[in-house]
């Protein structure tokens, strides 16, 4: 039975010391040390090398980031070396669980390791659904639309990020299929299908809540526009009568009776306009 070694932020010197018994080429060393952009699966007589990506939730920003993981599996000793840089929590949280993986070959190791990853992804979906449900509750109690839309947009972005990462993982599952038994394949396919369905449900749930908020926002905007139109009309009438008053006062210097009459007329007119619009509400 092989051992599992987790190495975080390993430099080239440490890397070469750790894998001194493995005939590892310089190109693979460079890939482990540097950042890569896509999933990769390579095999030779000595080892299997995998570039793999998993999601990590960043509490500070409430976002999901993609974490690159490099796996070097020694075929002669069945030792697995897991290299990762800048991990927020995954390998600290699941170290004991990964250390306990009982494997006699690459197939059993990779099936159990990916199962740990998928289980963590399922927990992320549960958190997203919980957050979205909280947003839904806040929507019904009248929380500010801007905050609701901001929080909901964050959930939608996290769902999209998680969907993209898991889609890439599915490519790896296809590549390792020939190394796993039928039972191991069934286990991974079940977990993968369940996660895909949960992600789809979370996406639809977020979309439904967003549409409800948008509808409410559009209705409120229409009401605000209606109020603004009424207010503008009242201001227009008031401005008109003020201009009329000024004209009368200027032209009628012989007395103030016309001036006060104009004031009374404008006030009554404004009251009439206000009463009219109030009766229309």
Give, region by region, the residue ranges found by the protein language model.
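Peripheral, non-transmembrane regulatory/ligand-interaction domains of membrane transport proteins
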Residues: 1-178, 279-280
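Alpha-helical transmembrane anchor segments
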Residues: 231-281
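A generic membrane alpha-helix/interface feature
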Residues: 41-43, 88, 221, 250, ...
């Amino acid at each position: 039975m092989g051992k599992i070694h987790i190495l975080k932020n390993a430099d080239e010197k440490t890397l070469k010391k750790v894998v001194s018994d493995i005939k590892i080429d310089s190109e693979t060393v460079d890939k482990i040390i540097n950042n890569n952009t896509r999933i990769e699966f390579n095999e030779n007589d000595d080892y299997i090398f995998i570039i793999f990506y998993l999601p990590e939730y960043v509490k500070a920003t409430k976002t999901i980031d993609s974490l690159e993981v490099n796996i070097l599996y020694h075929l002669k000793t069945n030792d697995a070396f897991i290299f990762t840089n800048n991990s927020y929590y995954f390998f600290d949280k699941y170290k004991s669980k990964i250390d306990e993986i009982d494997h006699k070959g690459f197939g059993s190791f990779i099936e159990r390791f990916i199962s740990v990853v998928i289980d963590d992804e399922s927990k992320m979906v549960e958190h997203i659904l919980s957050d979205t449900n909280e947003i839904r509750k806040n929507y019904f109690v009248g929380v500010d639309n801007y905050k609701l839309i901001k929080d909901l947009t964050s959930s939608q972005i996290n769902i999209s990020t998680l969907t993209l990462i898991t889609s890439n993982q599915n490519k790896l599952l296809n590549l390792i299929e020939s190394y796993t038994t039928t039972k191991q394949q069934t286990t991974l396919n079940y977990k993968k299908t369940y996660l895909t369905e949960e992600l789809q449900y979370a996406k639809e749930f977020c979309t439904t809540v967003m549409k409800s908020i948008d509808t409410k926002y559009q209705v409120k905007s229409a009401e605000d526009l209606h109020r603004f139109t009424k207010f503008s009309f009242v201001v227009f009438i008031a401005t008109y009568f003020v201009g009329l008053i000024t004209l009368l006062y200027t032209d009628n210097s012989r007395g103030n009776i016309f001036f006060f009459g104009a004031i009374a007329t404008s006030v009554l007119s404004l009251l009439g306009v206000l009463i009219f619009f109030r009766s229309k509400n």
